[in-house]
């Protein structure tokens, strides 16, 4: 059962989670990068750069730049689609899954303080 949060509570939760991430040793991801990561993990594959760009309403180069940074951190991987070589598939990694697990834990722990 979920409990609706007021505006101040929602912002406090976001602030507290953000502070915990900054104080921790997690990768410093932008909101766009976290959104991409959540999309890859919460929605059924396959995920292409084209599809992610459409979903986030940004250009393909914007997605590519975000994925470049995330790939260096091993949070996602990319490979050519063998069925359609024009497409690049964006895939999950163990490190990306662990990042989101820790983020979910931070949200859960900080939501208890509201």
Enumerate the predicted regions with their spans.
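N-terminal leader segment of winged-helix/HTH proteins
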Residues: 1-27
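Intrinsically disordered, low-complexity regulatory regions
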Residues: 2-6, 94, 111-114
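Basic, amphipathic "hinge/linker" alpha-helix immediately C-terminal to the N-terminal HTH DNA-binding motif
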Residues: 83-101
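N-terminal helix-turn-helix DNA-binding core of bacterial DNA-binding proteins
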Residues: 19-59
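Amphipathic alpha-helical dimerization/coiled-coil segments
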Residues: 17-21, 101-114
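Canonical helix-turn-helix DNA-binding module
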Residues: 46-88
């Amino acid at each position: 059962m979920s409990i609706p949060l007021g505006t101040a509570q929602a912002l406090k939760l976001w602030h507290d989670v953000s502070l915990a991430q900054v104080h921790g040793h997690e990768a410093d991801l932008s909101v766009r990068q976290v959104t991409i990561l959540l999309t890859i993990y919460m929605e059924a594959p396959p995920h292409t750069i084209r599809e992610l760009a459409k979903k986030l309403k940004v250009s393909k180069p914007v997605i590519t730049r975000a994925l470049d940074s995330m790939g260096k951190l091993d949070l996602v991987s990319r490979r050519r689609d063998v069925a359609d070589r024009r497409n690049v598939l964006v895939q999950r990694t163990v490190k990306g899954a662990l990042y989101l697990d820790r983020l979910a834990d931070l949200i859960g722990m900080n939501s208890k303080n509201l």
